[in-house]
Structures are given as C-alpha cells and as structure tokens.
C-alpha cells in the first residue's frame, strides 16, 4: 500500500514537470514568432515594402470586398523619409479576379515639405533686396499712360504685365546691373514718359533718384536707365539663361500694385521660341508660373544661386489678372542689350553669387590685373609703389570691423573702372601711381582705340567682345512690326541684317527659315568692300547655313582680326561666293559716320536700274514732272509733313543722319492695309521700295512706281529712333 501510494505521488510530480516544460516551450516559440514578425515588418519598411496595415490587409484576403488604395507618387520631396517612400515609376497590376485585392501600394503621406526643400531662396531674397528697385514713370501732359490690363482681355492673348496705374504715374520694377547707377527695366514701363524716378532700397531705408533713359528697344521690351547715386549701389548678377532647364525652380521679385519687394515662387514652365505680344514679336522668352502682376514688369526672375536669368515682361491673361502663365526676357538677351552701352557688367566670384560677393568684370584682354584679396577696414596699406595713395576699394573687398572684432565679409562696390589706354602712354598721375603697372587698373590697348562700327542710324556701337574680335555682338535698331520672325536687326561690320519673314520672303523669293536679308550696307565698311548690297540674302557664313541675324553674330564671335570669312549670298536668283575680311577698310570705318540714306547704293527692284545718289528713278515718267501733291492718303495712311528722324532723348550717338528726311504718318485708318502691317501714327517713312522719300515729289514718284510695279511694297520706317522694314 505504501509503495503504491509512493508510485502514485511520483507519477503526479512527473506530469506536472512535463506541463511546465511544454508551457516554457510554447512561450519561447511565441517570442520567436513575434521577433520574426517584427523583423519582417522592419525589413519591409526599410526596403520600401508594405506597411503593417497593408500586411494585415493581405492576411485578411477574401474576407471582405476589395479596396483600391490610391498611390501618391513622390517627387523630389519623397526622399525626405526613405522609410515611407514608394519606388518611382511603380505600376499597379489590376485585380486578377472579382473580389481580389489589387497589388497596389498603400497611400503614402509625406507630410508638409521641409523648409528650404527647393533651395536657399530666403538667402537669395536677402542678397537681392537692395538690387531690385521700384520704377515710377510719369506720362506727358500729366495724363496717365494707357494700361490695357486694367480692362477685360477677351482675346486671351499675351499682354504685357503693365505697370500699375496711379493717377498720372505708372509703377514698375527694375534691376540694378551696375553699382554706378545703371538699371534695366521694361520698355513698356517707361514708354511715353516725360520723367522717370527710381526708388532704391538700402539697409537703413530708401532713396528716390531721378533717372535718365539711356536706351530703349521695343522688340526686346527692354530699357536702360541711369541714376546718379550718392553711394555705390548693390548690383545683381546676370546669369546664363541658356543653362536654365524646364522645371527649374525660380522666384520673381517685383512691385506688384506698388507693393515693393514682393516675392513669388514657381518654375520654368517652357521656353518659347517666338511670341507675339501686343503686335510685337519677341523671341526666346522664358515661360514661368511664378506670379507676375501689374507692377512686376522689369523685375528679375531668379534661380537658386542668386543670379538673374530673366526680366519679367508679360503675362497670358483673359481678364487682366495673373492666370499662371508669365514670360520673361532671357538674361543673355538683356546682357547684350546692356553691354552695347556700358561695356562691362558685374559677375559672380569663385565663391558664388549666393554668398553676396560680386566682382567687377573688366573688358577682356590687355592684361588687366586681378583683384586683390579681401582686407580689414583700417588696415595700413603695405604697398610702396604708389598704391598706398589709392582708395583700397579699387582693388580689394573690405571686411568691416566692429566691437573689437571683425565682422563677416560684406561686398564693397568697386568704383567705375578707369578708361582703356594705349600701350606706351605717359601716365598723367603724380601721386605715386605713375610708378605702378598701368595694367593694374586700365585695359591696355595695342596702340589703337577699340574698334567701333557705325550703324545705319549714324551711331557708333562699341564691341561687346575684345578689340581683336570681328563680331559686333550687339542688337542693332529693332522694329516693332510683328513680321520680324521673332528677332530684330543686327549690324554686322557695316551690313544691317534682318530676319526673313513670310512677306519679305515673298518679295525676295526666299522661303522663311533660309537666309538673312541684308537691308542696308554702309559704304567704306568691310561689308561694302566684300561686295554686299542691300537686297542680298545671306545664306551661309564660313560654310554654315544661317537663318537668323543672331546666328551670324554668334559665328562671327569665333573669328579674329585678319581672318577671311566665306559668305554665300543669293542675288537676283544666283548664289555667289564672297569673302569678308577685317582689313584697313574695317578699321577706317570706325571713324566714318553713316552717310545720308539717299547716298547709299540701292538694289535693283522690279527690273529697274539702281538709282544714282541723289536721284529718283521714275519708270516711264515724263522729263518734266508735274507739281506733286502736298497731302497723301495712301493705303490707309494720311501724310502731310516731311521731317528728319528724331532719336530717343539721352541715347549717346543717336543723331539724325545729315540730310535724311521722311514722310511722317499723321493718322492710320483702323483696319487698313497699313494698320494691319503694323504702321502707327508718327511713324516716319524713309524709303519706299528702296527709294528715299525726303519730300513730296519723291514720295509721289515712289507711290506711282510701287503702284505700276503691282508687287508688294517694302517700306523703311523710323519709329522713335529705331529703323526697320515693313512689307505691305
């Protein structure tokens, strides 16, 4: 009995021990399973896989209706949280059967974009806050200039982002491009103005200056202003607009509705080859969705490195308000426009424009010395060669000091660079600078002044390239007609080049997109020496086909003095080869003013012989002509007076050509042939089919000759000092 009882007790203890072991085993397995599940969860999340909720959905397959969860594809900001990202370009397969779960990743919520995700634009605005100005233009006779965006725009076509109108003033924006007071803005901001004022911001407030209009270009919609600042201004840096890509982020800075330093953000939406805006063809505009409103005209379009890549000019709007489509003139076009007048512009230093360091870009060549390193304000000059008597800011940036310790570097605007001087010139200085190397401050010329070529309007244009270059890389006088095929006229070593339009192509028999029309040639220039004539069509330059004046200029930039350039020219239906050489004739042409238009060789038109200087050819006309009329009503134009061209006030070198006169258009009938072609009141017609019309007799003869020919009519027009061609 006792043994039996003992056996029973031993068996009970064994069963209890076995149960405990089983429980421990099951608990261990459960822990392992949880670890495996947790590890799988972490692995899936780290490799861009499904979230836990999606795993539970997969585990519950077949237990309920299928739900397709939309996918939010992440852009650049999707990389902020890689643990919750969705592979770019992932495609979702459709359900294989009714009620099945589609293999679609769940929606990913990235949350708000972090500050500064698109670039350091806040520092860019800080950098440019003193480089963007408000431009106020007052119209003549105290009347407000027209503002078409103030009314509805039912045609839905692009219109200028016109300056906001305040009683008798228009408000726009401008960009300081040089610290000595040069400012670029839009042509339509200051057109028709008799006074212009500029408000410049600084670190302590603002200063209002009276501005002078230096030059304007209607086709580019650009104007260059000049103020006389009390202290050096802060200049912006013009970047490379050709390097900007579609979808690059930009900001627009301006004065919309008079609200100064307003910043909007967007992207480059497109690059437009040609746009007709209010009857004027503009080329290579940058399209952006950054908000541009009335008053933004002339303001900068800026990329993340702080450089200006465009000058805001127009918007596409059905009602006058911003509709998400704006346009800006590329900075590369603005640079050429400015360099034609000022010669040099600031450029970013090695540290980058975003650091606020702006260096002076002197004319290339001549061995101009490099700028010195930054120095602390108040430091004694270590020089003993005369530089100790100079202003240190001529060569150095100054680091200001305060409270006994240096402050961060600040840009110090350098003074205006000294003028170029010929090598071997005797120094006029007596303060020690006569012992210095002149190349430290001056551009050294090889014994001669920089080459300049006169345009057909009589003004001398400076090279934007070194003196040894053949290219006059400038934009010459441009017309405002919409038949300009998107670009304007360029003067090339004495030849005025105009792009082919459909009407001009019909006149010459050359299709649009092939060749460049030569609208005028100045005597005693390389172009005239090569044999070019007005009416020729330039097909090739140095063996390369050309279709725009800018392409010709770009090719010529690569050439150097003394090199012969082969030209392919179409004349009277025959292709001829000519050679253009920059020899003594080219140098001598620098000092030759453009002759009177009546003295220029005229091409044969309509089978007529060329006109001799000072004479008018009248096919079939009597030897003694009757007294001509004094008033004309022709093609919708009323003409009563004849006068000499009047250049824009303040444009250096733009003087009337001696003896040149034209027929002034008093009025243009709406809807007439002249109005459709783009003629306006106060236009001055200089030539009709290459015949000068300096008086009633010549105009009457030219009208009769054009009527008898029965062909399209080619008019040379002067508008506000700019000459261009219109085909009727």
From Swiss-Prot:
Keywords: Autocatalytic cleavage, Biomineralization, Heme, Hydrolase, Iron, Magnetosome, Membrane, Metal-binding, Protease, Repeat, Transmembrane, Transmembrane helix. The active site is at residues 188, 221, 297. Its cofactor is heme. It is an enzyme of class 3 (hydrolase). Acts at 2 distinct steps of magnetosome formation; required for correct localization of proteins to the magnetosome while the protease activity is required for maturation of small magnetite crystals into larger, functional ones. The 2 functions are separable by mutation. Probably cleaves at least itself, MamO and MamP; cleavage requires the putative transport domain of MamO. Involved in localization of some proteins (at least MamA, MamC, MamF, MamI and MamJ) to the magnetosome. GO terms for molecular function: electron transfer activity; heme binding; metal ion binding; serine-type endopeptidase activity. NCBIfam families: MamE. Subject to autocatalytic cleavage; cleavage also requires MamO. Residues 43-728 are lumenal. A motif (MCR (magnetochrome) 1) lies at residues 375-398. This is Magnetosome formation protease MamE. Heme 1 binds at residues 392, 395-396. One of its GO terms (cellular component) is magnetosome membrane. In the N-terminal section; belongs to the peptidase S1C family. Heme 2 binds at residues 438, 441-442. Residues 471-573, 622-721 form the PDZ domain. Residues 1-21 are cytoplasmic. A motif (MCR 2) lies at residues 421-444. GO terms for biological process: proteolysis. Autoproteolysis is stimulated by exogenous substrates or peptides that bind to its PDZ domains; may be stimulated by an environmental cue in vivo. Protease activity is tightly regulated; increasing its activity decreases substrate levels and disturbs biomineralization. This bacteria makes up to 20 cubo-octahedral magnetosomes of about 45 nm in diameter which contain membrane-bound crystals of magnetite (Fe(3)O(4)). It comes from Paramagnetospirillum magneticum (strain ATCC 700264 / AMB-1). It is a single-pass membrane protein.
